[in-house]
Amino acid sequence: MAEYTLPDLDYDYSALEPHISGQINELHHSKHHAAYVAGANTALEKLEAAREAGDHSAIFLHEKNLAFHLGGHVNHSIWWKNLSPNGGDKPVGELAAAIDDQFGSFDKFRAQFTAAANGLQGSGWAVLGYDTLGQKLLTFQLYDQQANVPLGIIPLLQVDMWEHAFYLQYKNVKADYVTAFWNVVNWADVQDRFGKAVNQGKGLIFG
């Protein structure tokens, strides 16, 4: 059975400073993300054993645990690619045009995404996604690691609003963290995800 693995980063832990500290990135990647990977693999093993035993109550429990930990692994894998020491500025090309079409302007999109991040209660993520059914962009709040995700949505840009992502540096002032986040957004990665979502997402749910 294949196992999930912790991805290497494309940059050093300190490369996103001063916006996100190296200490946070090291703990975030080597401890928190690693824990989600380990949790997903453990849940997968227990799920396989429960299925072989025909233990349906255990199956449901381990499916729930797998959804949480695998959600954490997927979200963080996108997160690291969404960031770059050479990030910031604004998107260009087809993504920029789609943002203008859906939100009115980049500034209006940024305000909406920022509000989703700052207004999230508890732990979770703010997400810019592509709706493969409606063929449009949208923002939403993702609760914990896997809840409140609309069906048919492909995530393009995410900001981690769990406290482990910012508390060591920004304490309880998460609005400052979200402001700093915009300085390291890797728009080339977001553009690449958008292109794949548009071109490869057609017909995945409705033929």
Curated annotation (Swiss-Prot):
One of its GO terms (molecular function) is superoxide dismutase activity. PROSITE patterns: SOD_MN. Its EC number is 1.15.1.1. Its cofactor is Mn(2+). The keyword Transmembrane helix does not apply. It is an enzyme of class 1 (oxidoreductase). SUPFAM superfamilies: Fe,Mn superoxide dismutase (SOD), C-terminal domain, Fe,Mn superoxide dismutase (SOD), N-terminal domain. InterPro entries: Fe/Mn_Superoxide_Dismutase, Mn/Fe_SOD, Mn/Fe_SOD_BS, Mn/Fe_SOD_C, Mn/Fe_SOD_N, Mn/Fe_SOD_N_sf, SOD_C_sf. Binds 1 Mn(2+) ion per subunit. Mn(2+) binds at H28, H76, D160, H164. It catalyses: 2 superoxide + 2 H(+) = H2O2 + O2. Keywords: Manganese, Metal-binding, Oxidoreductase. The keyword Manganese applies. Belongs to the iron/manganese superoxide dismutase family. Destroys superoxide anion radicals which are normally produced within the cells and which are toxic to biological systems. This is Superoxide dismutase [Mn]. The gene is sodA.
